[in-house]
């Protein structure tokens, strides 16, 4: 693998490992008693602090003017991409498991395709193989999500992990006895989070056409998200002790979610997309499911069910169907552009030959002929 291919590959693997760590640490913090809305508020605050120097030093000379229209678009980005997405996701994570949460997150490309088609940012092309793959892949993703949500089945006997530590074991036992989990509400909220996240893609794509400053827009989005999430968390829980970060687990999970899973992840994904495109970045999302499933089994003693395995497999298969269709569509468009380019070149050549054939011919002094300009 060439160096130009190796660096984006390593960056995206690092992002998925970072997201896996966020799911594990956040689940442990919530099992230990941290409220999900408070965790989301701290995540936005830490993400704002971490993103500020990146946006300031990298875009202070190239940043377009921030107009009222841009601020309105950023506000809707914060509602969908920060507040709505993360509040729904973390409450859903509290009421499910990290493995199910990550599996349902793979619905994002399919949901994004549906919304993009509705808002005419994506063409379906049902008569072409690319369009058929996107539609079928979306349907398979939805079926997989339904299996994950409503069918558990039998436990898969893969044995017990020998490396989990007592701290995580005590937390998960305490959490399981507290009755927080709701394996119907949790998946539903995570699917709603995927819809909110997909809506952010639609709004962000529109905004990037006039405001090409991704780090600054992320900074503003996180800042507005901090205010929104902070207000929601204060209304729902204004007990001072619940906001305390004196516990190392609470502080680490909030700091990790903000710095690694928000600020660092966005920078690495933006860098990879500039070099390889968004499709390349999307292909790595199923890796998160594999990493989290291993970590959850090893560290949190999470049991794997046949329904989880079957639903996850369907979601991943459907995801790659959508991505294959998108990649095929890009290839088809490039082929069409190349054909148009060749046709234009052919027409231009024939036109030049026709013009030359129509030029008058004049005799030179030595009896030969030459063309004269009109």
Swiss-Prot record:
GO terms for molecular function: transmembrane transporter activity. It is a multi-pass membrane protein. Residues 330-374 are annotated as: Disordered. Keywords: Coiled coil, Membrane, Repeat, Transmembrane, Transmembrane helix. InterPro entries: EamA_dom (IPR000620), WAT1-related (IPR030184). It is found in: Membrane. Residues 19-149, 195-323 form the EamA domain. This is WAT1-related protein At1g09380.
